[in-house]
């Protein structure tokens, strides 16, 4: 059986990967229960950079509430997705999630819990996080 899984390129072009990226970022924006304008703009900026497509605010708001409709928890989906990502891309995604969480100038306990769950799902170690923070 041929392996049809291909690694992510520097830009995310696959629609399913783009949806998962939007969901992960939108949930980061709503981790503290509301999506602020700076968080919304940060999600839109990252999506444009990573996918080449503009995302409207309504898409971000819908994705931020997608846990109401999901059959598989986001953490599990991100874990599966991360197995196909090179370590550098996983680290970059962790940074992007942190950027969204901090976009409104705050980083509270709910955002920290979400970030920690995503880092675990991305299979990143503390030393890998230190290397990108330096």
Task: Please provide the spans of the model-predicted regions.
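Small-residue-enriched hydrophobic alpha-helices in membranes
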Residues: 1-134
